[in-house]
């Protein structure tokens, strides 16, 4: 029984500017399958190797798999669908499987537009995939698909079937990833010129922000034993020569006690590896006295979800942090030798040239080491997407990549929005390149920042940054001719829209019922009041009792 996993060849000009990122999903899935007795698992990274369709076809033909599996975030969905179609063209008997967050919630539409997909794994994939592979191995899968929990498929009569959800894996430490399945020499983090990994510290989130779907996908918040996470990192460092890692969690500092234990264990092991995280301003302020410990443990890069600059916008997005809190959190990190990156969301409905300029001025005032302006992108399966309703005009999911303006502001067209964002980038990083980075006193921070600048300049020179080459942007003189090439024929079909708008009784999460957002009379912006946040919104904290409860479930 041979299982072939393929990472689809999708590129967007976003996170890739820092290097090639190892697809951790395949290591966790392969490790779980091998522990379950299925050891013939092969991986092809079509994205990192930039494989053409013909090359993918050749790989499948040569490897002769029984099952081909792909994963897909929203912008990669069409590439994943095409990859699985190629597998069926090579051999119609191959069982084709799609996983990932997009298929989990958009399965009615995916199965309609890609009928060659035999099954979609919904949510956490390890146990579902093991059950599916077992059914295929026993020759009963196609006849008994309804007996495999956690999948969706199209029945012979065309009806879309979603089986009951598979319970989340309570003890994540049962999963031993097979990191050896990856070609590590190809996953280089450009700022440090070292191999990079993305291990899990926890899965899920205890909070239910409307712009996010992590809590909905994982269904339960579970955190790992910090010592076992460090065991995994030690394997990555000593066996695979990894020199930098980023925790995959949206916010690993949620569980304060466990995060402290994680840092203490890293210090104890003295692995000499640097790492980065995403987190919230409120967590940094909460942990002010712990920042020296974090830095001693190797934490070198923190990306903060500050999102919006003008206080008006902070209020509009229901962000319970203030401008001064953002500024203070950034300074605290810098004072402790930690590189800071501020994340801003742009392109809201009320965006203007003036608010974009305010964003730039605020970035200069806060003075983070780096700034990132991401386009406002409502995931089609998020609560936010439903709240926006007919304000969403673009359904070409390949462009849902945070660098393409999906939403059009009322006061400007998309080309001008892109141009002004590029102006912010140019001015911000020119100042850093000539007046700040080379003169940073901390040697390790200076080396890291100059490496980040190298990655930024490299992607700009190659026209890969922000997909500039593909859309035809060459500066302000081209803002009127930029072509985002939206496929206007793509829509959300009625069945998918119905599935998204109703509660799925078979998809139960740990979270209590959410409070429905209602439009305030006369307030045209209220429906997007929770919209413009990457992770970093709000001030919620886990209480000591809640932290203890997660530990009990994991034990």
From Swiss-Prot:
Q: Look up the record and name the cofactor or cofactors this protein needs.
A: [4Fe-4S] cluster; adenosylcob(III)alamin
* InterPro entries cross-referenced by the UniProt entry: Cobalamin-bd, Elp3/MiaA/NifB-like_rSAM, Methyltransferase_Class_B, rSAM, rSAM_horseshoe, Tetrapyrrole_Bchl_Biosynth_MTs
Say yes or no: keyword 4Fe-4S present: yes
Pathway listed for it is: Porphyrin-containing compound metabolism; bacteriochlorophyll biosynthesis (light-independent)
The name under which this protein is listed is Anaerobic magnesium-protoporphyrin IX monomethyl ester cyclase
Sites where the protein binds [4Fe-4S] cluster: 205, 209, 212
Q: Which Gene3D superfamilies match?
A: Cobalamin-binding domain, tm_1862 like domain
Gene Ontology CC terms: cytosol
What family does the entry list? Answer: Belongs to the BchE family.
Function of the molecule: Involved in the tetrapyrrole biosynthetic pathways leading to chlorophyll and bacteriochlorophyll (BChl). Catalyzes the anaerobic formation of the isocyclic ring (E-ring) in Mg-protoporphyrin monomethyl ester (MPE) to yield protochlorophyllide a (PChlide a) via a six-electron oxidation and the formation of an oxo group at position C13 using oxygen from a water molecule.
| Reaction equation(s) it catalyzes | Mg-protoporphyrin IX 13-monomethyl ester + 3 S-adenosyl-L-methionine + H2O = 3,8-divinyl protochlorophyllide a + 3 5'-deoxyadenosine + 3 L-methionine + 4 H(+)
EC number assigned by the record: 1.21.98.3
Q: What class of enzyme is it?
A: oxidoreductase
Q: Which residues form the B12-binding domain?
A: 9-143
Source organism phylogeny: Bacteria, Pseudomonadati, Pseudomonadota, Betaproteobacteria, Burkholderiales
MF terms in GO: 4 iron, 4 sulfur cluster binding; cobalamin binding; metal ion binding; oxidoreductase activity
Q: Please, one GO biological process term?
A: light-independent bacteriochlorophyll biosynthetic process
As recorded in Swiss-Prot or TrEMBL, the protein's gene is named bchE
Q: Which Pfam families match?
A: B12-binding, Radical_SAM
Q: Which SUPFAM superfamilies match?
A: Radical SAM enzymes
Origin species, per record, is: Rubrivivax gelatinosus
Provide the alphabetized UniProt keywords: 4Fe-4S, Bacteriochlorophyll biosynthesis, Chlorophyll biosynthesis, Cobalamin, Cobalt, Iron, Iron-sulfur, Metal-binding, Oxidoreductase, Photosynthesis, S-adenosyl-L-methionine
Note accompanying the cofactor annotation: Binds 1 [4Fe-4S] cluster.
Limits of the Radical SAM core domain:
191-416
Mutant lacking the gene: phenotype: Cells do not exhibit a phenotype under high-aeration respiratory growth conditions. In contrast, under low-aerated respiratory growth conditions, the absence of BchE leads to an accumulation of MgPMME.
